[in-house]
Regions:
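Conserved hydrophobic/aromatic packing and binding residues within compact polymer-binding modules
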Residues: 17-20, 50
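Residue-level "edge-of-site" marker
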Residues: 20, 33, 66
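Short glycine/proline-centered loop/turn elements that form peptide/ligand docking sites
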Residues: 3-6, 13-16, 33
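Glycine-centered, phosphate/nucleic-acid-interacting loop/turn motifs that mediate DNA/RNA or nucleotide
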Residues: 24
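Arg/Lys-rich, alpha-helical DNA-contact motif
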Residues: 2-8, 27-30, 38-128
Length: 128
């Protein structure tokens, strides 16, 4: 299959596929005499793995390590646990910040009497 087909099957943009090739997340594909890239089912599976990992928020270096681990099914998954735990910790931190932000926004809205901007608690709070 060609890159457009891979893009359609995986839901990953063509430019992103090319980028993943450049950074080593996808192997360089074989090429036809015309120079067009040719992909197989393993490329579809690998790209699906990369996409899912990226959707879960893993950075490229973590995805690279996870791909490497995937190719060694007999190895311990300790490194995968470490990577996933670090990602979970980052998600928990973001959730905490978002929870605080939500509370701040609710408070600002509740404290604003809706009259004039000169007395607007929202504007005052943002201005510091």
């Amino acid at each position: 299959m060609q890159i457009g087909d891979l893009s359609q099957r995986s839901g990953v943009k063509i430019e992103t596929i090319r980028y993943y090739e450049r950074v080593g997340l996808l192997p360089r594909p074989d090429r036809l005499a015309s120079g067009r890239r040719v992909y197989g089912e393993e490329d579809v599976r690998r790209l699906g793995f990369v996409r899912h990992a990226r959707d879960m928020g893993f950075d490229l270096s973590s995805v690279r390590v996870l791909l490497s681990l995937k190719e060694k099914p007999g190895e311990s998954c300790g490194e995968a646990i470490r990577i996933a735990q670090a990602q979970l910790d980052a998600v928990e931190e973001r959730l905490s910040r978002l929870t605080d932000l939500r509370a701040d926004l609710k408070r600002m809205i509740a404290e604003c009497d809706g009259r004039q901007v000169s007395d607007c608690r929202i504007i005052e709070t943002i201005a510091g």
